[in-house]
Amino acid sequence: MGAGGTQSQLRLFRNPGFAALAVMNFVRGMAFATIIVALALYADLFETSGFVAGLFGTAYAFVRLVLVVPVGRWIDVRDAKRLLVIGLVLQVVVLAGYVFVESALQLVGVRAFQGVSSITVYLAGTAIVGSLGPEGDRGLWVGTYQNVTAFSKLSGDLLGAGLLFFVGFESTWAIFVVLSTLSVGYVLKHLPAEPVPSDDSSSTAGKLLGLLKRRAIMALVAFRFSFSFCKEAVLIFLPVFARLEFGMNALLIGGILAGGRFTKSISQGYIGQLGDRVGRLHWFILVGIVLYAIGTAMIPLAVHADEFIDPVALTVAGREETIPGAFFVLFFCYVLLGIADSLRIPTSVTMFVREGEYQDAVGSSISLRSLSWQIGATIGPVAVGVMTDVLSYTAAFWAAATLALCAGVLFATLYRDEPPPE
């Protein structure tokens, strides 16, 4: 990234509103990434089947699916800051709930409740940052905000995984309860009490139908229905694959995920700014889709890694650890997935915010973005889990990669450039 782009991003943190959103987003993302690592450990601890491990993702996504439209509409007609604070308080309760998890069924329940806090914080935060960003710099604002998300998840992969490795579940969740509580106070103090620009003259259905008449929105929604199947399946089952097939500990799983997170943390802001400058945002999305499919299809190659990559032995805090060859294959795959996400995510968010502003419905547009994701996200983890039980991890990951490519074809077929509506 050039010096000018870096300086532009750093300048955003002088804005009190953006800084408050960034702090909140950092804590949220770090906790989320730590939970993803923990799910693989829980799957091993509770000796779950692939189906039950899939429920860890499906329970979370199903609740988000149910709530995404009403939450988005709330943002359009009421104070988005108030909703954001409610979601952050629920996040504290969720993290406290993880302290008491003692079975797979309890974990599924906590994951479902996490879906409530997650969708609330995600939609409110994204809508606010998209609307605060001035015209011409919105891609920079959105990209930098996503950059914070990526960097926070990178921190979760490393620091959160380290906490799980050294101090265990209960102490890790207690630390995140404290951090999340502090982030609530910071948002209350520094985020301006300004709702997202709203217009309550039409119904939720009317807003969504109006947005779907736009070809860009139609293409994005159709693509996200199937692409989310792949994305969420990888998110849940790559760590589970690493744990159950190769016995990797929390540090190694976190290290794998850190590869992709690091890529996103250093590139999304630049990609957002590049999109502002050159336009043609749909090309960024298409290239990202293809790269994601390739990275997903390569994941099963890890089972052959020891044939050409020797294990590496090292000592961590007095403990002897062996890094299997599969670690390096999975690390490379997740780096490739991180590059793909860097191309796709900031440009997609910018397109949804832009189209939402045309119709004074930023909240509904962002909620439509999430709604289109949640169906595949709900089905994907369980479907892939069943495939790992009945077939194999190879079949499951290849099926996910195929669906990602189909999503790209669908997007390319439906997308058309259109002028703003009259």
Regions found by a protein language model. Name each.
Residues 2-15, 190-223, 244:
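Juxtamembrane intracellular "pre-TM" segments in multi-pass secondary transporters
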Residues 37-51, 236-252:
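Short amphipathic helix-loop junctions that connect adjacent transmembrane helices
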Residues 47, 79, 100-105, 247, ...:
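Helix-breaking motifs and short loop linkers at transmembrane-helix boundaries and internal kinks
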Residues 66-102:
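Conserved MFS/SLC helix-loop-helix module at the cytosolic interface between two early adjacent transmembrane helices
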Residues 82-97, 283-298, 398:
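Structural signature of the two symmetry-related core transmembrane helices
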Residues 110-151:
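Cytoplasmic helix-loop-helix junction between adjacent transmembrane helices
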Residues 177-196, 407-415:
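C-terminal membrane-cytosol helix-exit motif in multi-pass small-molecule transporters
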